[in-house]
Design a protein with these regions (language model features):
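Active-site-proximal helices and loops of the catalytic beta/alpha 8
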Residues: 2-93, 150-196
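Loop/helix patches that line or flank the sugar-binding groove of alpha-linked glycan CAZymes
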Residues: 95-232
Length: 232
């Protein structure tokens, strides 16, 4: 990975490298080979890794489709949420190696997942849950990542009802962005909210600290007695 990054950056210095840093050894993995996984981030400086921790805490575990996360009212470990906001110091050598997100190409979209975990909630409440997830990962230390269309409440309807959580072979009717939804004011409001989050992050350098030392010096959790509250 280091050789690949060095070769590409010789001609294209602005290319960003990131990926899924899961430790997925197979029978072909040599025992003396160190893999480019989250826990080895210090060995691949400049390479970013998806944070499955922030994803699962915000929306619910990937391995149980109806399990709620923090944004749907579940009580989750505050220490884990605080670590996410600070760019996962347990494995990310530098904050820019932690890629924060709530949805990507795999699994259900964020809004679909919220529909599964909060089926009785009105749409207005689900939208607020969606926006809470976006605010948390976009304002956390690290690199924010959002799936195309999340800013317009992207959904992937299933062929036989429900939602498609593995759409790599699904048709355009599932994977396309439904631009017509932007005709509705509530969808435009979400789009504006995402734009505002991005602008706010760009405007405040303290949300984009570049070293682990800077994060430790500038970002501190604030004690909240409410189990549903985290503050910094």
């Amino acid at each position: 990975i280091n050789e690949i990054m060095a070769a590409v950056h010789q001609k294209h210095p602005n290319v960003i490298f990131y990926g899924e840093g899961w430790d997925m050894k197979t029978e072909l993995t040599k025992p003396d080979v160190r893999l480019a996984v989250q826990t080895n981030s210090a060995m691949v400086p400049g390479f970013g890794f998806f944070s499955d921790t922030i994803r699962d805490l915000l929306r619910g575990t990937t391995f149980e489709s109806t399990a709620p996360g923090f944004v749907a009212g579940a009580v989750v470990p505050k220490e884990a949420l605080e670590a996410c906001f600070m760019g996962m110091p347990s494995w990310a050598a530098q904050p820019n190696q932690c890629v924060n997100y709530a949805s990507c190409h795999d699994n259900t979209t964020l809004f679909d997942r919220i529909a599964l975990t909060a089926p009785e909630a009105p749409v207005e409440t689900r939208i607020r849950m969606n926006n809470l997830a976006a605010a948390f990962y976009m304002l956390s230390q690290g690199v924010p990542f959002l799936q195309a269309g999340e800013e317009m409440l992207r959904t992937k309807p299933g062929k036989h009802g429900g939602f498609d959580d593995n759409s790599y072979r699904s048709p355009d009717s599932v994977n396309s962005l439904k631009w017509v939804t932007l005709d509705k004011p509530e969808y435009q409001d979400v789009l504006s909210y995402y734009k505002g989050l991005i602008a706010f992050r760009k405007a405040h350098c303290v949300l984009r600290l570049s070293t682990r030392e800077d994060v430790q010096r500038c970002v501190h959790p604030v004690c909240c007695e409410n189990e549903h509250c985290v503050a910094f």
